[in-house]
From Swiss-Prot:
Binds 1 zinc ion per subunit. GO terms for biological process: threonyl-tRNA aminoacylation. The lineage of its organism: Bacteria, Pseudomonadati, Pseudomonadota, Gammaproteobacteria, Enterobacterales. GO terms for cellular component: cytosol. This is Threonine--tRNA ligase. Residues 1-61 form the TGS domain. Catalyzes the attachment of threonine to tRNA(Thr) in a two-step reaction: L-threonine is first activated by ATP to form Thr-AMP and then transferred to the acceptor end of tRNA(Thr). Also edits incorrectly charged L-seryl-tRNA(Thr). Keywords: Aminoacyl-tRNA synthetase, ATP-binding, Cytoplasm, Ligase, Metal-binding, Nucleotide-binding, Protein biosynthesis, RNA-binding, tRNA-binding, Zinc. Residues 243-534 are annotated as: Catalytic.
C-alpha cells in the first residue's frame, strides 16, 4: 500500500502499485497538457513509471520556476544529439545552462560557422517533430566508461574519470539511441523543447587551458512558450543594435586588430570621449581633495612578490626582462601607490592621503574572453587609494560614496545596486578588526539611506568591500564602482605612519574606483545611449551644412567662430541634396545639425535641427551659442527643447 506524498503537502494511499499516469489523472487531470517533467523522490520519471512503495512526487509544469532549466538541460542534449547526427565524427565536450539559455562545447573535425546553424537547427526541429520520450538509467561507472569509450567520446571519459567516484552509479539520459551524462532533470518528451534558437558560435580551449585543443562553443536560448522566445529574441535584436563594437565602427571611435589582441587603437573621435571623461573625473578629484599621481608601467617582480599579487594573480600578469632583471607590466596600481606613500616619513597629521591615478594596466585575459571595450588586456583604471587611520575611516568611506553618486548622476543611470561583501572563510587579521570594519561599512551605507544586498563571505581575504552596480535601460548590471578595505597590503609592503604618541602605526588602505575601467565605461555609455552621447561627450557637437556653393563662405565664417570658442564643429560643403546630408549626419549621432541657406544668410541666423529630428527653427547665432555652451558646461543629459 504505497503512500504518495505531493509537493503541496497532501498525501494519498493506494491499495496497490500504481502508475504515475493514474496518479495524475486522479490528482491533477487538468495539468496533463502543461506537464513537462515528473520527479519521484527527486529523480526523473515518466508517465509509465510504476510506484510500488512510499514516494514523494513533484509535478512540474511550464509555469513552475524550475521549468526553464529543465527545458534547457533537455535542449543541451538535443543539440549534442543533432550535432552527432549531422557530423558523426564530432566529439562532445562540456555543456551548461546560462541565464537565458545554454551552451555546448563540441570538437568538430572541421570548424563550423553560423551558416551551419540553419542545418543544425533544422535537424533539431526534425528530432522534436518525432515527439520521442526521453528515458533515464542509472548504470555502474565501469559500464558507463565502456559505453563512452566505444563511442570514442574522449571528453566525456575525462569528465567521468575526474568528477565521478568509481563506486557510484552514473546517471544517463537517453534521447532515442543517443545517451549523455545527467547534468540536470529533463523533460519527459522532446516536444517541450520546440521554442529554442541557436544564436552564436565562439572558440573555447578545453578546460580553459590554452595548451589544450580549441573547441567550438555553440550558444542557444530556449523558453517555455513562443511568446517568451519572441520577447527574448526582440531583446537580443535591441542588444545588437546597441552593440558598442558596431556603433564604435560606425562613429569611427576605435578599432582593434589581431596583431594586438585586447588592445585599443583609439581614433580621434574616440579619444575625444576618453579625454572628456578623464577631464570630468579629474575635476571631481580636485573637488574631493585627491592628489593625482603617476606610477611606472614596469615594476620589478620583487614588489609584486612582496605584495602577494604574484602568488595570487601571476597567470594574469605580463612580464618582461632587461639586464637579467624580471619586471611585471602592472596589472593594477595599488603597489605603486604604496611606494609613493612609503617615500618619506608620514605623520598622523598627514593623513588622510587620497592618492588617485589614471593608471594604464595590463592583464593577460584569455583570448576567448576578450569582448570589444568590455573585456580587454590594456585598460585605464580611475583608481584611488586612501591612506587613513581607524578614526578617519567612516568619514572617508562616506566621502567615497558621495563622490561615486555625484559622478554617476551625470550619466542619468536610473538604478544603482549596492552590494556589501563580508569576511570570507580564508582571511587574515583579527576578528575584532573585521567586526569593526564591517560595522563601519554597513553603518555608513545605512546612514546614507542606501539599500544594499549582503554577500556573505564574498569579501577579499584582506578586507570587506562595497560594490556599486549600474543597471542600464535594458536591465543589465554593470559592476563599476568599488570601495575595498585593505589591512594586508600595508603590512606586506611595510607602510606606517607616526602617531601622536610617536609610535609606528599601520594605516588602513581604502581601494576606490568609480568608473572602473574608462574603456569599459565608454562601452557601457555607447550601449546605454545607442551612440547618442550627451553633447559634452560627443566627439563632434555641431555640424554646419551648406545648401549650395553660394553659402559656403557664410558656413566657413560660422565654423571659425564656433571653433574659436572651443565648440567641436565640422562643416559639410559638398554639393549634395540637403536631405541626404541631414540623414548622414543624423546617423553619425551629431547632436546639432545647422543649416545655412539664403534665408539664414539674409537674417544672419541659422536653422537648427537635433539628431532626434526636432526642428528648433531659425535661431539667432549668439542665442544658440549661449544655450549650447550652458548645455556643455553643465554636462547636461538633455538637449535643447527636450
Amino acid at each position: 500500500m504505497p503512500v504518495i506524498r505531493f509537493c503541496d503537502g497532501s498525501q494519498q494511499v493506494y491499495k496497490h502499485s500504481v502508475s504515475l499516469r493514474e496518479i495524475i489523472e486522479n490528482k491533477k487531470p487538468n495539468i496533463i497538457r502543461s506537464l513537462i517533467a515528473i520527479s519521484v523522490n527527486n529523480s526523473f520519471s515518466n508517465f509509465n513509471t510504476l510506484i510500488t512503495e512510499d514516494s514523494s512526487i513533484s509535478f512540474i509544469s511550464k509555469k513552475d520556476c524550475e521549468a526553464l532549466n529543465i527545458i534547457r538541460y533537455s535542449c543541451i542534449q538535443l543539440l549534442n544529439y543533432a550535432a552527432k547526427k549531422t557530423w558523426p565524427s564530432c566529439k562532445i565536450g562540456e555543456s551548461e545552462i546560462t541565464k537565458s539559455g545554454f551552451y555546448c562545447d563540441i570538437d568538430f573535425e572541421n570548424s563550423i560557422t553560423e551558416e551551419d546553424f540553419f542545418i543544425l537547427e533544422n535537424n533539431m526541429k526534425t528530432l522534436i517533430k518525432r515527439e520521442y520520450f526521453i528515458s533515464h538509467q542509472n548504470i555502474s561507472f565501469d559500464h558507463a566508461y565502456e559505453m563512452f569509450k566505444k563511442k570514442s567520446e574522449i571528453y566525456k571519459i575525462h569528465l567521468i574519470k575526474k568528477y565521478i567516484n568509481k563506486k557510484n552509479k552514473i546517471s544517463l539520459y537517453y534521447h532515442e539511441n543517443y545517451f549523455d551524462i545527467d547534468m540536470g532533470m529533463q523533460v519527459f518528451n522532446i516536444k517541450f523543447c520546440k521554442y529554442f534558437k541557436l544564436q552564436k558560435i565562439g572558440g573555447i580551449y578545453w578546460k580553459g587551458d590554452h595548451k589544450n585543443k580549441m573547441l567550438q562553443r555553440i550558444y542557444g536560448t530556449a523558453w517555455s512558450t513562443k511568446k517568451e522566445l519572441d520577447k527574448h529574441l526582440s531583446y537580443i535584436n535591441e542588444l545588437k543594435k546597441r552593440d558598442h563594437r558596431k556603433i564604435g565602427k560606425l562613429l569611427n571611435l576605435y578599432h582593434m586588430q589581431k596583431e594586438s589582441p585586447g588592445m585599443i587603437f583609439w581614433h580621434n573621435n574616440g579619444w575625444i570621449i576618453f579625454n572628456e571623461l578623464e577631464i570630468f573625473v579629474r575635476e571631481k578629484l580636485k573637488e574631493y581633495k585627491y592628489k593625482e599621481v603617476k606610477t611606472p608601467l614596469l615594476i620589478d617582480k620583487s614588489i609584486w612578490q612582496k605584495s602577494g599579487h604574484w602568488d595570487n594573480y601571476q597567470d594574469a600578469i605580463f612580464t618582461t626582462s632587461s639586464e637579467n632583471r624580471e619586471y611585471c607590466i602592472k596589472p593594477m596600481n595599488c603597489p605603486g601607490h604604496v611606494q609613493i606613500f612609503n617615500c618619506g616619513l608620514k605623520s598622523y597629521r598627514d593623513l588622510p592621503i587620497r592618492m588617485a591615478e589614471f593608471g594604464s594596466c595590463h592583464r593577460n585575459e584569455s583570448s576567448g574572453s576578450l569582448h570589444g571595450l568590455m573585456r580587454i588586456r590594456n585598460f585605464t583604471q580611475d583608481d584611488a587609494h586612501i591612506f587613513c587611520t581607524q578614526e578617519q575611516l567612516r568619514y572617508e568611506i562616506n566621502n567615497c560614496i558621495k563622490m561615486i553618486y555625484d559622478l554617476y548622476s551625470t550619466f542619468n543611470f536610473k538604478k544603482i545596486l549596492v552590494k556589501f561583501s563580508t569576511r570570507p572563510k580564508k582571511r587574515i587579521g583579527d576578528e575584532s578588526v573585521w567586526d569593526q570594519a564591517e560595522k563601519d561599512l554597513s553603518d555608513v551605507l545605512i546612514e546614507n539611506n542606501l539599500k544594499f544586498e549582503h554577500q556573505e563571505g564574498e569579501g577579499a581575504f584582506y578586507g570587506p568591500k562595497i560594490e556599486f552596480v549600474l543597471q542600464d535601460s535594458l536591465d543589465r548590471n554593470w559592476q563599476c564602482g568599488t570601495i575595498q578595505l585593505d589591512f594586508y597590503l600595508p603590512i606586506r609592503l611595510r607602510s606606517f605612519y607616526i602617531d601622536e604618541h610617536n609610535h609606528q602605526k599601520i594605516p588602513i588602505i581604502i581601494h576606490r574606483a568609480i568608473l572602473g575601467s574608462i574603456e569599459r565605461f565608454i562601452g557601457i555609455l555607447i550601449e546605454e545611449f545607442s551612440g547618442k552621447l550627451p553633447t559634452w561627450l560627443s566627439p563632434i557637437q555641431v555640424v554646419i551644412l551648406s545648401i549650395t556653393d553660394s553659402h559656403i563662405n557664410y558656413v566657413k565664417k560660422i565654423v571659425q567662430h564656433f571653433s574659436d570658442i572651443n565648440i567641436r564643429v565640422e562643416s559639410d560643403l559638398r554639393n549634395e541634396k540637403i536631405g541626404f546630408k541631414i540623414r548622414e549626419h543624423t546617423l553619425r549621432q551629431i547632436p546639432y545639425i545647422l543649416i545655412c541657406g539664403e534665408k539664414e544668410i539674409k537674417s544672419k541666423k541659422i536653422s537648427v535641427r537635433t539628431r532626434n529630428g526636432y526642428n528648433l527653427g531659425i535661431i539667432d547665432i549668439d542665442c544658440f551659442i549661449k544655450k549650447l555652451q550652458k548645455e556643455i558646461f553643465t554636462r547636461s543629459f538633455y538637449q535643447m527643447e527636450e
